[in-house]
Structures are given as structure tokens and as C-alpha cells.
Amino acid sequence: MDLLTLAKNVAQRVEAQATQAKVPVAVCVVDVHGNVVLQHRMPGAPLFSLELSERKAYTSALVRLRTADLVPLVQPGQALYPLIMVSGGRYSAMGGGVSLAREGEVVAGVGVSGGRRSRISTSSKRQ
């Protein structure tokens, strides 16, 4: 499956979950270099959620971690604190970003923004 097809499948699953939860979101899928493959904002999702979803996807693709797992690592004095400080806002350490792996290798990053963390899942899946 090519990356665009994978991105469309992921976006459809995210939107279905968000629709069921009645929480409009934005979703972004990027390749391993951080280039946008797909962006989608559901009607009613906050306008800023599109940008945040891209930052979350970018971070997950390049750092290869869930963005929620970065939170303790980017605090002052911690190992990845400089990453956030010098990135010009490009990286995100808020929940909602995951990397996608195929055959053990990261192929994309996915970011979801606009929903409440407890409602919309961004589980990493092997494709």
C-alpha cells in the first residue's frame, strides 16, 4: 500500500472515531521527512487544530515517539529540552501524535488535534 492510500485509511478511521464521539478534529499525515501527505479538518474543528495536527505528525515522524511520551523529556533540564527551544515551534510535545510503522520501520507520522484526549485515540498501528 502506498503512503497516500495509508494516509487516507488512517484519516477515515480517525474521522469515524471522532464522528462517533461527536468531537470534530483535524488530522495530518506526514512522511518520514515531515512532508505533508494528507491534511483534513472536520467541520466544526477549531481552526488552529490543522496547524497543531501537522506539528504533532511532524514530531512523531522525525522523533519516532508518541508526542505524549515527549512531555517529560522536554522539560527544563531534561535531555530533549533544547529540541523544543530551538525548533521555532515546529515540534510539539502535546498528546495526539504517533508514528506509523510498517515491517518494523517508521513510514509516517500522524497528528490529531481538536478532540479531547480521552475521546479520540491515536494508537500506533503496524501497517
Question: Where in this protein do the model-derived segments appear?
Answer:
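Flexible, solvent-exposed loop/hinge segments and secondary-structure transition points
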Residues: 1-127
